[in-house]
Amino acid sequence: MFDAKKFLTDVSHEPGVYRMYDDKDQVIYVGKAKDLKKRLSSYFRKNLSSKKTEALVASIHHIDTTLTSSETEALLLEHNFIKLYQPRYNVLLRDDKSYPFILLTKERHQRITSYRGSKKFAGEYFGPYPHAGAVRETLSLLQKLFPVRQCENSVYSNRSRPCLQYQIGRCSAPCVQGYVSDEEYNQQVELARLFLQGKDQQVLDYLIGKMEQASRNLDFEQAARYRDQIQAVRSVIEKQFVSNERLDDMDIMSIAYQHGLACVQVMFIRQGKVLGNRSYFPKVPANTDLSELTETFVGQFYLQGHQGRSIPNSIIVDRQLAEKSELEQLLSEQAGRKVTIQESVKGDKSKYLQLAQVNAKAALNVQLKQSSRMSERYQALCDLLNLPKIKRMECFDISHTMGNQTVASCVVFNKEGPLKSDYRRFNIEGITGGDDYAAMEQVLQKRYERDLEEDKIPDIIFIDGGKGQLNRALNVFQHLQVKWDKNRPHLIGVAKGVDRRAGQEVLIISKQDREIHLPDDSLALHLIQHIRDESHNHAISGHRKKRQKAFTQSGLETIEGVGAKRRQALLKYLGGLQGVKKATLDEIASVPGISPKLAERIFETLKND
């Protein structure tokens, strides 16, 4: 039992971070304090503030502390530790994806493209957008309004005539001389920039002025083009929310909570434009106060490695925050400018907050219905297999094209649904092309021949295939030499029916040595189909990426001494990949940056291919 009195005698009154561990040496809670001794002492009073705290204290085996120079530093360290340890009594943000931006590059003929990652390329970044779909929609809209190129430089540099985008009026063809002047092209780039900045009226004023000027010059064809562009821009503006206020860059957050599930709705507004919204479903311990949830979410959302998320000037929330000033100070330091957190707003900001609240409740209701359906299906599967509970299920599938670029997938489910952070793909190598049995053996060996923690051992392993696939899987498990209990998982084959139609699947249960034909309306079958389809889609998407990579690689990447710059030079000076392959040794050696020795290596490699 943890001796709190003895522990507290050595705790400092300095600011810092504390980590609480259970008897398995797992971090179960991370917290921070202005005064460590005062804060930690509060956990061991007779009357604790909540049932959550009571459960936490009952699980403590030992506590570690880390001193910091300030409370702000402690706040940052706390969020880093939460991300590292994922403690079960902390609120956990389960979404750690970076966010996409729109990038306006800095080059002679600037291009507009989507970008995700650190801002390492020169140019202007607009965003972040809530998801890739919002970026694609905006890029498609920009193409219709402003004929600015969106193609890759490798395409742009090797054009001898305009592409289809020019033919349909979505690019002005700066890649080919004589179609558009630099001045005209830069005018359209500037209009696109103003539009992305939310300066719609400036765009309209400019276009109206150009239309009137063209009319005065009797250039009615050009005036008509400006008229059409004005109508297109106005049509877009009319569909957008019109605000009488000048809205700053801001994120608006609202939380809905019901039946142990929380939804945080985040609305992104940049330069006066609503870029979209996104729902988050953080893992919330029972009996967590919603103000604590909001506070923790804000910190994790912006501070955990940034994840490509830009910190706006203003963050609007619908809960009072106890540590508002500390969060503002830390976010301001991270952003390099003043960042404010607003808990009470009026006007259009209030309307946006109400909209976020409505969306949060709607998204939560959808999630609750999905969770309810998942729970019913999960229980039906438990009943079917005569199992008291199923903690973890894994499913495997193989994908290839004529035996090439073979990829195996593993998807993971628990009673709440997919555990996408645990999904894995495996490259299959060293087998006869198209041998799915050998591929299944290899992926199972890769997955299970290593040590597994207790909570990572699956209760059920679904094999997408019939008796042949299942027997290979059983053979792999029979020969596994591992410390964990390899007899625990139930191996189940999911064979397609006679007509290979959904709903006619046959379950082959290895431990019970029986086959089950389930009716179309079986909830257990619906769950198995969901898991199987998820595995199938995961395998196919991985295979397509691998196939596309093999298709687009030029062969130059594998040659020692040929990096990205030399590859670009070869393609540029010799007219693309076919030009490089047809080039003589002397022609390759004439490319800037290519030595005679390297030219010989390139020539021999491509000749042998």
Swiss-Prot record:
The UvrABC repair system catalyzes the recognition and processing of DNA lesions. UvrC both incises the 5' and 3' sides of the lesion. The N-terminal half is responsible for the 3' incision and the C-terminal half is responsible for the 5' incision. This is UvrABC system protein C. It comes from Haemophilus influenzae (strain ATCC 51907 / DSM 11121 / KW20 / Rd). Its main location: cytoplasm. Residues 201-236 form the UVR domain. GO terms for biological process: DNA damage response; nucleotide-excision repair; SOS response. The keyword Cell inner membrane does not apply. Interacts with UvrB in an incision complex. It is found in: Cytoplasm. InterPro entries: GIY-YIG_endonuc, GIY-YIG_endonuc_sf, GIY-YIG_UvrC_Cho, Hlx-hairpin-Hlx_DNA-bd_motif, RuvA_2-like, UVR_dom, UVR_dom_sf, UvrABC_protein_C. HAMAP family: UvrC. GO terms for cellular component: cytoplasm; excinuclease repair complex. GO terms for molecular function: DNA binding; excinuclease ABC activity. Residues 13-91 form the GIY-YIG domain. PANTHER family: UVRABC SYSTEM PROTEIN C (PTHR30562:SF1), UVRC/OXIDOREDUCTASE (PTHR30562). Keywords: Cytoplasm, DNA damage, DNA excision, DNA repair, Excision nuclease, SOS response. Belongs to the UvrC family. Transmembrane segments: none annotated.
